[in-house]
Amino acid sequence: MPSTREIRRRIRSVKNLAQITRAMEMVSASKMRRAQRNVLATRPYADRLLDVMGELTGRAVGMRRGTLLEVRPVVKGVALIVVTPDRGLAGSLVANVLRRASRFILDEQEKKHTVEVLAIGKKGRDFMVRTRQNLVAEVTKLGDYPRLTDILGIATNVINGFLSGRYDEVYVLYSQFVNTLVQRPTIKRLLPIDPPHEPAERMVDYTYEPSQEEVLRALLPRFVEVQLYQAVLEAIASEHSARMVAMRNATDNAKELQRDLTLSYNKTRQANITKEVSEIASGAAALAEM
């Protein structure tokens, strides 16, 4: 049985750990709220951009070939953008995303497709290197509040790759923020773009300058960039949410362990007192018999 001194030392250690995890929980909660606001702030722009593209593609018939709208009959090259955190301590979030990435890559390889991976985040980058996947680009250290310009390199890479024929399809894998307790690994196709088509009776007769085709060609890359940026923001909100929950669970477990150790300490202390009293009583009885 451990001594009372050893148990007291363990109680202090667990108490200090609980204070650390509680502080990390509070920090993650604050960052999660700001990350959620960032996600919501981008949605009006993305929704309006989607509406305009639906209007334009409905009018610019036959403009798919040679653009980011072109659906190719035979798929040979596939790009997968994997969005993960730079840091751990986020529960099973990273493992779930990487497990989904491995399954996607395996499925595409079984179809005889060449898969190239572009990693956003250290965890995904390290996993792809460790498993010897075809990693062609990486972006790390985006921080908690990345800007659109931070992901333009990756976006430009896949856009140029698609237009050159290197990629026939481009996907992004990220952790979708559902709510504080649920973050879902999600794969979304970025390219070719499949915008909604407005019914003819709902179309408004806008005038576009210099032309509908030119405006559409300019908007298509912006749409890909915004979609990728939204995926990154969703992943960051999911990361902070998962870390907050993980740290809360760690704090609760530490407090429970502290209670168990305190109970063990009291039992050990009581046993020592009982032993000392018994020894004193035995000594007194021995003296009385002399």
Swiss-Prot record:
Q: Which InterPro entries match?
A: ATP_synth_F1_ATPase_gsu, ATP_synth_F1_gsu, ATP_synth_F1_gsu_CS
Q: Which Gene3D superfamilies match?
A: 3.40.1380.10, ATP synthase, gamma subunit, helix hairpin domain
Biological process terms in GO annotation: proton motive force-driven plasma membrane ATP synthesis
Kindly state which keywords UniProt assigns to this record, in alphabetical order.
Answer: ATP synthesis, Cell membrane, CF(1), Hydrogen ion transport, Ion transport, Membrane, Transport
Q: Which domain of life is it from?
A: Bacteria
Localization, per the record, is: Cell membrane
What SUPFAM superfamilies does the database record attribute to this sequence? ATP synthase (F1-ATPase), gamma subunit
Single annotated GO MF: proton-transporting ATP synthase activity, rotational mechanism
Query: Which Pfam family, an example, fits this chain?
Result: ATP-synt
Where does this protein chiefly localize? membrane
The answer to keyword Cell membrane applying to this record is: yes
Task: Tell me the membrane topology, using the record's own terms.
Answer: Peripheral membrane protein
| UniProt xrefs under PROSITE patterns | ATPASE_GAMMA
Instruction: Identify the GO cellular component terms for this protein.
Output: plasma membrane; proton-transporting ATP synthase complex
Family membership noted in the UniProt record: Belongs to the ATPase gamma chain family.
Q: Report quaternary structure and partners.
A: F-type ATPases have 2 components, CF(1) - the catalytic core - and CF(0) - the membrane proton channel. CF(1) has five subunits: alpha(3), beta(3), gamma(1), delta(1), epsilon(1). CF(0) has three main subunits: a, b and c.
Role, per record: Produces ATP from ADP in the presence of a proton gradient across the membrane. The gamma chain is believed to be important in regulating ATPase activity and the flow of protons through the CF(0) complex.
**Protein name per Swiss-Prot or TrEMBL:** ATP synthase gamma chain
Identify the coding gene. Answer: atpG
